A protein has these predicted regions:
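Core catalytic alpha/beta fold that binds nucleotide/phospho-ligands
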Residues: 1-195
Length: 195
């Protein structure tokens, strides 16, 4: 048997995950479980971004006519698809980063500026990301307080992430360094064009 060439970049690791959107939709439709779910999967800056993007859609009154109910169901399905994609992305990052035991609050999925894509950040030092259900506040005052923390400087390792949706499923793939190289913390990887 001829010798096989090694993989050209042995320092890369890949992770993937799939999430069933109707499962997340059941949580979105449950007023008691939904805030717990958001606090479990998102860091504070991610919750603030979610709140800014979806607050008005989730605060709408229950529609009284059939057309209104169908529109609300469509909107909630879109929110569930977004959350399922973020869940799958975080799980993919956790699977790709075998060099460290990660939990959901160790990972941020962020939107690229000037693009529709996303990328992941594996946080180096984790501040308590979980908060009580009351921390997720739909009021304007709650939004302002949370939005101020978006700019909080936190170091971490950037990883490549791709999210895709098809029918009832959201899937994500992550490509990450097996172990962060010295100097790949705090934006140096981005400066070298690694993402």
């Amino acid at each position: 048997m001829p010798p096989f060439r090694p993989f050209p970049s042995p320092s890369l690791s890949i992770g993937t995950d799939i999430c069933h959107i109707p499962r997340v939709l059941r949580l979105v439709n449950n007023q008691k479980l939904f805030p717990r779910f958001l606090n479990r999967i998102f860091t504070q800056p991610e919750r603030a971004a979610f709140q800014t993007r979806f607050r008005n859609l989730l605060k709408q009154e229950t529609a009284s006519d059939d057309a209104g109910r169908k529109e609300q169901a469509f909107v909630r399905r879109g929110i569930a698809a977004h959350l399922a994609g973020r869940w799958a992305a975080k799980e993919a990052v956790i699977k790709a980063c075998t060099w460290r035991r990660l939990v959901l609050s160790d990972v941020r999925i962020l939107k690229r500026e000037q693009s529709s894509g996303v990328y992941g950040v594996v946080l180096d030092q984790v501040k308590a990301a979980r908060q009580t259900e009351d921390a997720f506040d739909w009021t304007e005052e709650g939004t302002d307080a949370v939005e101020q923390d978006i700019g909080v400087d936190r170091s971490g390792q950037i990883v490549k992430v791709s999210i895709s949706h098809d029918g009832d499923y959201a899937t994500a793939v992550c490509l990450a360094a097996e172990e962060p190289a010295e100097g790949d913390v705090g934006g140096e990887a981005a400066a070298r064009g690694m993402f």
